[in-house]
Design a protein with these regions (language model features):
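A short glycine-enriched loop-to-beta-strand structural element that forms part of the catalytic core
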Residues: 19, 104-121
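Alpha-helical scaffold within the catalytic cores of cyclic-nucleotide enzymes
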Residues: 42-60, 71-110, 131-140
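Short loop/turn motifs enriched for small/polar and acidic residues
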Residues: 68, 111-117, 153-155
Length: 199
C-alpha cells in the first residue's frame, strides 16, 4: 500500500497570497429540469464563457468551473479588482443574451476570500489548494441571491477603495466545515452620485 503513495516534495513548495472569487448560478437545477437539454447546455456554455471573459478583463485568472459555478483568483494586492469583478458578474449575467431569448431572469451568489495557497498545473489546468479556496465555496453558498459576501481580510484590503462599500452582516454566518463566522461583509459598488458628494 505504501508503494502507492505519492512522495512528498523534497523542498518546500512556494506559496502565495491570493484573493478568490466564487460565483454560483441560483436555481440551476430547476433550469435543468425545465429546459430541453440542448437549451440548458447552450445557456451554461454562454454563462461560463461570459464569466471567463469578465474575470479576465478585471485581471483575474479562472481556475475552474463546475457546471453552474466559476472560481477565479487574483494576487492579494488586487483585492479591489477581485471584488469589482464579482459585483460586475451579477449585472453581466442578468443581461445574458440567451437567457433573455428564453425568457429567463438569472441571478448569482458571490463570495470573495483571501489567504495563503499553493498553485500549480494538474492535468494541464491551473489549480489552487488552500483554505481560502474551500472558504470561498462555503461563503458563496451562504450568500443570498444577488449578494456578494467577503471575508474580513478582503474587506480590510479594500478599506481605502472609493468604489466599494461594505456592510457587516447583522448576524454571524454559519458555514459548513467552518462553523460560525462573525465578520462577514456584504460588498456593494459605490454609486456615482455618492462619489460626487464625497468629492
Amino acid at each position: 500500500m505504501a508503494d502507492l503513495l505519492l512522495p512528498l516534495a523534497s523542498s518546500p513548495v512556494a506559496t502565495q497570497q491570493a484573493c478568490f472569487v466564487m460565483v454560483d448560478l441560483v436555481g440551476s437545477t430547476v433550469l435543468a429540469q425545465r429546459l430541453p437539454v440542448d437549451h440548458y447546455a447552450a445557456l451554461m456554455a454562454e454563462f461560463v464563457q461570459l464569466l471567463y471573459l469578465s474575470f479576465e478583463a478585471h485581471g483575474g485568472c479562472v481556475l475552474q468551473h463546475q457546471g453552474d459555478a466559476v472560481l477565479a483568483f487574483w494576487p492579494q494586492d488586487q483585492a479591489e479588482a477581485a471584488v469589482l469583478a464579482a459585483l460586475d458578474a451579477h449585472g453581466r449575467v442578468a443581461r445574458l443574451r440567451l437567457a433573455g431569448l428564453l425568457g429567463l431572469s438569472l441571478r448569482l451568489r458571490g463570495a470573495v476570500t483571501s489567504g495563503e495557497v499553493i498553485t500549480g498545473h494538474i492535468g494541464g489546468q491551473l489549480s489552487a489548494y488552500g483554505l481560502p479556496v474551500n472558504f470561498a465555496r462555503r461563503l458563496c453558498g451562504g450568500a443570498q441571491p444577488g449578494q456578494t459576501l467577503v471575508c474580513q481580510i478582503v474587506q480590510s484590503g479594500c478599506a481605502a477603495s472609493a468604489r466599494l462599500e461594505f456592510g457587516l452582516l447583522g448576524e454571524p454566518l454559519e458555514l459548513r466545515d467552518f462553523g460560525e463566522i462573525c465578520e462577514v461583509y456584504e460588498a456593494r459598488r459605490v454609486l456615482r452620485d455618492n462619489q460626487m458628494k464625497v468629492g
